[in-house]
Amino acid sequence: MSIEWLSEKLSEQGIELSNTQKEQFQKYYKLLVEWNKKMNLTSITDEHDVYLKHFYDSIAPSFYYDFNGQLSLCDIGAGAGFPSIPLKIVYPELKVTIVDSLNKRIQFLNHLAAELGLEDVSFVHDRAETYGKGVYRESYDIVTARAVARLTVLSELCLPLVNKGGQFLALKSSKGKEELQEATFAINILGGNVKETYTFELPENAGERQMIIIDKRRQTSKKYPRKPGTPNKSPLVES
């Protein structure tokens, strides 16, 4: 059973899943596959692959970063809830907000949270560029993003939401360090400073992952993020 595989792999890292948490992951998989038939949530639907490439992959950052405590976490472009919902299941005290530009995905997440009995979660239908200009600007302890865009673009979408003293966790594939070289200029302009990069392999040769931890040292200038679409079309790079 894939849930037993996940439980065993997490146990090796010192994370013990309760029966309730195991049931939540099993329900999550079931709902993901059901809803995926009517909307495009994921191309990965095989049970073991979901447990490995979505659930385990989402939780792996916690092997290197402490998510314990009542931390506020904003997840940008989480799609079907990765990485923040698996993290919320394992660390129930997290206060999670997911921002996604597609309303259908927000509907799925609302249904998912209700079915899993998750508290302190909210789902916002908005563009990150707009959300980063609003009342929640510079209000989160942690902002995460996984497989959304290149790091230069992600930095402009995510760093404005991080409070001073908080951190942006960029979850990347094997190209993270390469993207980081390009993104250093943008990170600095936006008030960030690269703290650390962790590189690790998923089990079963499922790929290399990198987690880049960026400290928020200074407030972000009010001109960022720029209007929707601009960060992607004209990334902040040194001219």
UniProtKB/Swiss-Prot annotation:
One of its GO terms (molecular function) is rRNA (guanine-N7-)-methyltransferase activity. Keywords: Cytoplasm, Methyltransferase, rRNA processing, S-adenosyl-L-methionine, Transferase. It is an enzyme of class 2 (transferase). The keyword Iron does not apply. It comes from the Bacteria. Residues 217-239 are annotated as: Disordered. One of its GO terms (cellular component) is cytosol. Its EC number is 2.1.1.-. Its main location: cytoplasm. Specifically methylates the N7 position of guanine in position 535 of 16S rRNA. This is Ribosomal RNA small subunit methyltransferase G. The gene is rsmG.
